[in-house]
């Protein structure tokens, strides 16, 4: 396949896997926080604060994956090499 097509596929699959992992992690965190609050309603403030901090950390994974995918798509260091190879093949 062409280099840029492979870059688009890699970015798409990378973002899909990153979003899937982030969604599973956030779902499990919220599930456990809700279970903790249902067992001990008095500790809901500490549990919810800790959950929010944890969710922010988990969400940072999706942001990092997005940044890497954008780098693959728009600031790829091998773009010039691929263009030169394509020109050589065309000649």
From Swiss-Prot:
Pfam name, any one: ATP-synt_C
Record-level GO BP terms: proton motive force-driven ATP synthesis
GO molecular function: lipid binding; proton-transporting ATP synthase activity, rotational mechanism
Gene Ontology cellular component terms for the protein in this record: plasma membrane; proton-transporting ATP synthase complex; proton-transporting two-sector ATPase complex, proton-transporting domain
Locations listed in the record: Cell inner membrane
Matching InterPro entries: ATP_synth_csu_bac/chlpt (IPR005953), ATP_synth_F0_csu (IPR000454), ATP_synth_F0_csu_DDCD_BS (IPR020537), ATPase_proteolipid_c-like_dom (IPR002379), F/V-ATP_Csub_sf (IPR035921)
Chief location: membrane
Keywords assigned: ATP synthesis, Cell inner membrane, Cell membrane, CF(0), Hydrogen ion transport, Ion transport, Lipid-binding, Membrane, Transmembrane, Transmembrane helix, Transport
Site (Reversibly protonated during proton transport): 59
Topology in membrane: Multi-pass membrane protein
Transmembrane annotation, as ranges: 4-24, 53-73
Similarity comment: Belongs to the ATPase C chain family.
Subunit: F-type ATPases have 2 components, F(1) - the catalytic core - and F(0) - the membrane proton channel. F(1) has five subunits: alpha(3), beta(3), gamma(1), delta(1), epsilon(1). F(0) has three main subunits: a(1), b(2) and c(10-14). The alpha and beta chains form an alternating ring which encloses part of the gamma chain. F(1) is attached to F(0) by a central stalk formed by the gamma and epsilon chains, while a peripheral stalk is formed by the delta and b chains.
PANTHER family in alphabetical order: ATP SYNTHASE LIPID-BINDING PROTEIN, MITOCHONDRIAL, ATPASE PROTEIN 9
Purpose: F(1)F(0) ATP synthase produces ATP from ADP in the presence of a proton or sodium gradient. F-type ATPases consist of two structural domains, F(1) containing the extramembraneous catalytic core and F(0) containing the membrane proton channel, linked together by a central stalk and a peripheral stalk. During catalysis, ATP synthesis in the catalytic domain of F(1) is coupled via a rotary mechanism of the central stalk subunits to proton translocation. Key component of the F(0) channel; it plays a direct role in translocation across the membrane. A homomeric c-ring of between 10-14 subunits forms the central stalk rotor element with the F(1) delta and epsilon subunits.
NCBIfam families: ATP_synt_c
Protein name: ATP synthase subunit c
């Amino acid at each position: 396949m062409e280099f840029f097509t492979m870059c688009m596929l890699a970015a798409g699959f990378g973002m899909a896997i990153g979003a899937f992992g982030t969604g599973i992690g956030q779902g499990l965190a919220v599930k456990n926080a809700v279970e903790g609050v249902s067992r001990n309603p008095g500790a809901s403030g500490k549990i919810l604060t800790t959950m929010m901090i944890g969710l922010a950390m988990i969400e940072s994974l999706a942001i990092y994956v997005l940044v890497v995918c954008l780098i693959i798509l728009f600031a790829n260091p091998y773009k010039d090499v691929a263009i030169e190879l394509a020109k050589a093949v065309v000649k």
